[in-house]
Amino acid sequence: MTDQVRPSERLEYSAIIDRPVLKLPDGARMIVWTILNVEVWDSTKPQPRMVITPAAGGSPIPDVPNWAWHEYGNRVGFWRLKEVLDAFEVPTTLALNGSICTEYPRIAEEALKANWEFMGHGFSQLSMQKVEDERLDIQKTRDIIQEFTGKQPRGWLGPALTETFETVDL
């Protein structure tokens, strides 16, 4: 037996056909929430994603091709996306690993300058199930984002969309 609260116990079931129609502002029919994830991948550990499967299999360290894929995003991809989002004045949320503020501060500075909303995304790109102290990781992430922006981050998106049964309560 476990004391953990399951996700299905946090939310009462509600079929969409039994709910009142959701009225959106200005008669809109759809909401689009633009979230840009920016992450720090540790080159001394197996990479969180494999775009290129190593020829010999396994998880080589360093895994330069997959680490470089992430690094391209921070050096090029972020800036190209930001240019388009700025051009069309798209309100954006930056889901960032807290360590972005120290390892890639230029990215965080530009998002802050653009008045983007900041959302915690772990301190580094490591599954919440693998983080040694989840409470500390979340607190460290919140603290560094608040120190950088002057505001608490709004919301949480676990790295790789992961969370534990305790994440919501932390």
Q: What residue spans do the PLM features occupy?
A:
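Catalytic alpha-helical scaffold of carbohydrate-active enzymes acting on polysaccharides/glycoconjugates
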Residues: T2-G155, A160-L170
